[in-house]
Amino acid sequence: MAPTEKKRTTRKKKDPDAPKRSLSAYMFFANENRDIVRAENPGISFGQVGKLLGEKWKALTPEDKIPYENKADTDKKRYEKEKAEYAKKNAA
């Protein structure tokens, strides 16, 4: 094999029954505000939408972020619970 060639590694297939990962506070914010940003800026690219959402998130005060952080905490607890149940089910 030539020194510039890379070995192909096969990725482990994801189990469709595995619990979905928890969302971060930013992701809850982005999901809630994505359509608003698109409506305010028609015709912008997907990347630009993300950039504007990031700027809006950074501009929020810590108090404004609290509802999103609470949602993220709740979702994290859900994920941990589902992950434990999934691990218990698949260990047997």
From Swiss-Prot:
Where, if anywhere, are coiled coils annotated? none
Q: Which GO terms describe its molecular function?
A: DNA binding
Name the lineage. Eukaryota, Fungi, Dikarya, Ascomycota, Saccharomycotina
Query: Pfam families attached here?
Result: HMG_box (PF00505)
Could you tell me where this protein is found in the cell? Answer: Nucleus; Chromosome
What does this chain do? DNA-binding protein that induces severe bending of DNA. Required for DNA-binding by the FACT complex, a general chromatin factor that acts to reorganize nucleosomes. The FACT complex is involved in multiple processes that require DNA as a template such as mRNA elongation, DNA replication and DNA repair. Also augments the fidelity of transcription by RNA polymerase III independently of any role in the FACT complex.
What is the annotated quaternary arrangement, including any partners? Answer: Weakly associates with the stable SPT16-POB3 heterodimer to form the FACT complex.
Q: What is its main location?
A: nucleus
What would be the name of the gene that encodes this protein? NHP6
Provide one Gene Ontology biological process annotation.
Answer: DNA repair
What SUPFAM superfamilies would the database entry show? HMG-box
Record feature DNA-binding region, as residue ranges: 19-87
> What are the boundaries of the region Disordered?
1-21, 63-92
What is the designated name of this protein? Non-histone chromosomal protein 6
Q: Print the keywords alphabetically.
A: Chromosome, DNA damage, DNA repair, DNA-binding, Nucleus, Transcription, Transcription regulation
Query: Which InterPro entries does this one have?
Result: HMG_box_dom (IPR009071), HMG_box_dom_sf (IPR036910), HMGB (IPR050342)
Task: Provide GO CC annotations from the record.
Answer: chromosome; nucleus
Q: What family does the Swiss-Prot or TrEMBL record give for this protein?
A: Belongs to the NHP6 family.
